[in-house]
């Protein structure tokens, strides 16, 4: 009877076929390293953020008078409210950390090379939506840093010639950060952007499963198949890769819980101390700094004296990620088989990005200004010079099999 019901459903809604195509019979490379775990971890944290976000949304008040008070109510009076909030705030930082590592893996092993261009573009779009989602959520507690951080970021729209002032008011919905701003940011944060994010993640996975997952060697496993057309150097995603990822997921869960229970503020990087004070439009904090995952772009913004020029540089720093598939002219995908120029370039890129991140969290000094300019140039040089150094360098022969 159960079998008949399942067959009836599957005939009309191909659940079994979908499960087999994307999980139980989906071939993935049999040899990968720990860099390939971050995609699965990102999916887990995304689910965690959605679930905790729903619970936080229930007692939250999206008004100017009630926003900060409702956060305090959640922390003090709602049963387990404090752990749900810390789970959400810790999850936000962990989500960005995982996605940064996931993107770095893509740069290391050429996860953007033909035919994976759409996989990369969907991933870059996910990152862009995450940045918007994180900013909107950052404003909702209506603490001191939320208020003034939003004021700084939204005021950037005012630097756009001709339409800037009107656009700034339109984004805020008022002439200052008010209840109207909180309400519209709340709607976008809990409804619009999560739906877009989920849709993009689905497209990202479908595109990935269509062209096949990569591997550290950059070998095309589709070249050698058995009589059934299954790649010889592959294993089914489920249960093999799922079970092999379980220890890493357990370690990640342990680290996550340690941070959540013992260091939820993350030394002021996850939750700024100024945000434990209610927003006061009459008192400006001594140092306005973004959350750590926006810090590199904030440093680029500050590196340019002209506000509009800084806005262009900051936007270009994100936009240039989208065209990486067409900048890399190398005939190999993996950094293992690229030349010394690519290896030097990616080391300089990592150093510049981390330095930019640090500079964005500290007060501005003359030395910091010089360093921010140098690191901004290094950041863009990695991308803009990529067509040159990937074309002229000597590469190594890629093995045929894993």
Predicted regions and their residues:
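Membrane-embedded and interfacial regions of multi-pass energy-transducing membrane proteins
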Residues: 1-94, 98-402
